[in-house]
Amino acid sequence: MASSPRPTTPNSQKKRSGRRQSHRSSGAYNILPQSPKIHYPVDPDNLPLEAPGNTEKFESLSDALEELDVNMTNLQSIHEAISDGFNESFASFLYGLSITMWCVDFPGCPSRNQWEKLKLVEGLDDRISELAEKIRSHREENERLKNRLASNVVESTEEVENHSDSHENRKPQHSHRVGKGPTRQVDEGDDTYMTNEGSFVVNPSAPSATRIPQPVKTAPRRFTKHTPPPPPPPPPADTSMHSSYRGPNLNQPPRYMRGLFDSTNRPTTPSNNRSKRVANPNRIQKATGRPPFR
């Protein structure tokens, strides 16, 4: 037997049979069911892949692949048109705009400073509108408080007038008589206009009784169409010669500060004698005879 010029692997059949024998000797070979080793007859006129159902499926698969190829071709053409035709043209257009922007001045467009000023003005307008709204609300509140205060003042004035009328009706009018001269009618004035809503004195207490007659303070009277004006006071009478049964005569001219303003501030004879008095010698002798103070 002539040797083959091609190299062959030695003992290849022996290795295959040994590997098959090792698989058969394993546990998996004993567990798995054995093949029945049934061989169906092969009909060359009726192959499995040439069945009508399989043929239709392969035809539909071929049509789908052709359609996919057409779609991919169209997508590739679109991509090339965008990358080559549109992107380059659009990029050149944007580049031209940027170059024109840097090289050409547009007088109608605001500059950066003008744009910042416009933004600042818009903020000021918003602030002004907000402040105007606050001022309007405060004015309404002020008007409401004024109306409320006016109503409170009217109510308090009516209450004080009613109180003063009831007080005048309840308390009879009296006059202070000094000496035996003509008397002066004392009229308690209406102090309605002197009172207000925030006054802490509404009903002043009556003064305590005293033997010394006090000067009467009459508040200015508010004249209305229903209140007649008081009569003028009578001229003061000379009551220096009459004595009062209630106390001292208070209608005398001032004597306490008379020497400060006229020429009566002169030393009198008794004061001069008092100042020129000679010390008593007996008193001096008694003072010298005393022991020293310890």
Swiss-Prot record:
Subcellular location: Nucleus; Cytoplasm, Cytoskeleton, Spindle; Chromosome, Centromere, Kinetochore
Bias-annotated ranges (Basic residues): 13-23
Main location class: nucleus
A Pfam family assignment: DASH_Dam1
Alphabetically ordered keywords of this record: Cell cycle, Cell division, Centromere, Chromosome, Chromosome partition, Coiled coil, Cytoplasm, Cytoskeleton, Kinetochore, Microtubule, Mitosis, Nucleus
Coiled-coil ranges from the UniProt annotation: 121-163
Biased composition (Basic and acidic residues): 160-171
BP-aspect Gene Ontology terms: attachment of spindle microtubules to kinetochore; cell division; mitotic sister chromatid biorientation; protein transport along microtubule to mitotic spindle pole body
Membrane-spanning segments: none
Region ranges (Disordered): 1-47, 140-294
Subunit structure: Component of the DASH complex consisting of ASK1, DAD1, DAD2, DAD3, DAD4, DAM1, DUO1, HSK3, SPC19 and SPC34, with a stoichiometry of one copy of each subunit per complex. Multiple DASH complexes oligomerize to form a ring that encircles spindle microtubules and organizes the rod-like NDC80 complexes of the outer kinetochore. DASH complex oligomerization strengthens microtubule attachments. Within the complex, DAM1 and DUO1 may form the microtubule connections. On cytoplasmic microtubules, DASH complexes appear to form patches instead of rings.
Reported function: Component of the DASH complex that connects microtubules with kinetochores and couples microtubule depolymerisation to chromosome movement; it is involved in retrieving kinetochores to the spindle poles before their re-orientation on the spindle in early mitosis and allows microtubule depolymerization to pull chromosomes apart and resist detachment during anaphase.
Name of protein: DASH complex subunit DAM1
Species of the source: Debaryomyces hansenii (strain ATCC 36239 / CBS 767 / BCRC 21394 / JCM 1990 / NBRC 0083 / IGC 2968)
Gene that produces this protein: DAM1
